[in-house]
């Protein structure tokens, strides 16, 4: 049968001081394991030598919580390699590799326990550790291994195959199957199968158990198997129960040892002494109970001394390493998951001490049995010292009665300590009703006693006869609620769960059974619910989920639902100093119960739910805000009109808040309006741009046609006038006055020499001339002071917020809608001196003079180019000066320039479709 194989560390590529690879030879709750040197070269290597040549069946690795190797390779060899000779490395045969989790999901607070099933024969095992996973805790790029466990059996190759074949042949003829035991009671336990691996050989067992107690458990397990073989089932049952109790004892002693080591490291020697004495008393009490029931004495054929200490198997040339090392960071803790080390211990240490300590056990005491006797025994069979004297002959086995079994169970688990004076005063009413023994159990420092007290109280309340006096029933209920309140605050999950079970029984069974009133149910809920809600914000995810599920379940009890108490607690506004978990749990509970209970006679109303949800929209935690949005949408489905009363109006200013934008878009979906996707929006913009360009071209063609007709009409009129003048002014010599020809503009060159923004036409407006006009003179354009691009004044605000190179330095004022530098924005908003902007359909808002004026595109031309318009348009001064200059000139040159000066107020309108974004926003860069 495969079992635990002892080993020694032959070599390693290096280690950090105090974290030698020899630490891997010890399995205990306080071990620290091996760590590579800081900033080491990869790969790192460790070579182990097993106590004998064996067939390895299973390898277990307990990884560090943050010093994690990305990959670990396994090699096996029959003999020790000599690294000085290169070809000797070929002696190792590669078995494969495993990849380790980077532990990001647990925040580097859990240790991964990796089990690898192999089938290889050898005596030397080599582990190669590759590059570490990077995380914020592993600042030195190290890899570490807390523990390694090897499970296998001796490799007797000459007989193994024959024995295996013979066993299979016998099973075949007897109709047995190793995977389908004949006795269903043996399924999953030891049944004589050759491939069975005992749970006591698992690495998780040793890493949580006190070493002495773990060795005693192994002895009792051997005796249990012998008793089963001899069909002494009563004795086997007794041993099975003792093993179960001892596992709890071992976990407790292991935790005491960790707390003692932590106290020593903090130089709190009083606490260390107290823990040492506590361990000694508890250990002596347990051993006394075991001796009382004959559990420390083996059968005559199984008797073995308990006189040798647990120590690693080391060769004479490799001295023992007993060096204390510092504890792990306080943030580290073991988490029980499918792939992580477990189980979770029910009793947690005090808050002042870390949950782990990495210290080595003390060196073995001198004066024990000779070393030669140790080497005869297999590594995992070495006995531990229990008493200084040698045990006598085994006593005869006696039948154990049920009452005796109960006494033993209580003795092994430990009796509750007496109540202190403070506890006596605090729980005086409960003691008078329930008795001091039960209350002492509920106040005990041992979690098992606290749990047993609650279970005993549960049983006591269930057995209360129906005809009991009402006063006694109410006193019993109030005393029970008092203990429940204390247990709800317990940090141990099993005690907390027992309190929930007891509270549920009181509300759903005890009160209805004895026909107590609603006042008693109200008393239970009011006293327990605030504490339950606080536990819903616990840092432990396991306790948090238990509390959330129970609150939801309790709110649906028919006895509690009619009281409408729980909804009134949940709609209370979130406190600013509340924990993140509590805020998330409260909004999550409200969302759950709102779906289950609705708003009709449930304690939830549209008013109180919406007030809570709107206030939750301002919470600092994203998950809280997201759940609040979901609550508002749920309320809108049922009460749309009442829901809208608690929200701001749906306008562009409100939609600038992303949460309200999501809310109103959700309303639209609920109402049946189909909102376009982002792809659809982009497609619509492209279509709109094309339509605008097409419309612009059509308008230009229409304008060109109109101007052509006007020129033809004007030419006809001028021709008639010229004929009349010709007749009137004809001189005797037959000469006629020749009028200068009127210049005509071809239709296909109408846009030549024209500014499409201000409408000015000038012969100097060539391609370069227009660039100069845009850059310096056009009244509709301006230069951005930050990126020096030329933009339309009407779109200056949008440019500063979305297109400018310095756009990250601007914010939008919700009052005037202008782009304000972010460092000035808080003061700008606070003073409220800006001119409020109106909706685009009502008025335009000028970013230069900050005034509102008539809406529309033409209004921009009037405002920016007219004499009574914008007073802050600096280009207007230059144009006015340019227009008045010809009037001040003298002579024909001045008159000629006056007649040829371009008109500022051109009547050519700006195209209604507007320009494409590429041409209307940014025109040139210096």
From Swiss-Prot:
Gene3D superfamilies: Leucine-rich Repeat Variant, Zinc/RING finger domain, C3HC4 (zinc finger). InterPro entries: ARM-like (IPR011989), ARM-type_fold (IPR016024), CEP104-like (IPR052607), CEP104_N (IPR048739), CEP104_Znf (IPR048738), Galactose-bd-like_sf (IPR008979), TOG (IPR034085), Znf_RING/FYVE/PHD (IPR013083). HEAT repeats lie at residues 522-558, 603-639. Residues 889-903 have a biased composition (Low complexity). Residues 916-926 have a biased composition (Polar residues). Keywords: Cell projection, Coiled coil, Cytoplasm, Cytoskeleton, Repeat. It is found in: Cell projection, Cilium; Cytoplasm, Cytoskeleton, Microtubule organizing center, Centrosome, Centriole; Cytoplasm, Cytoskeleton, Microtubule organizing center, Centrosome; Cytoplasm, Cytoskeleton, Spindle pole. Residues 398-409, 690-701, 718-729 have a biased composition (Basic and acidic residues). Residues 212-279, 678-730 form a coiled coil. Pfam families: CEP104-like_TOG, CEP104_N, CEP104_ZnF. Residues 345-419, 690-741, 885-926 are annotated as: Disordered. One of its GO terms (cellular component) is centriole. Interacts with CCP110 and CEP97. Interacts with ARMC9, TOGARAM1, CCDC66 and CSPP1. Required for ciliogenesis and for structural integrity at the ciliary tip. This is Centrosomal protein of 104 kDa. It comes from Mus musculus (Mouse). The gene is Cep104.
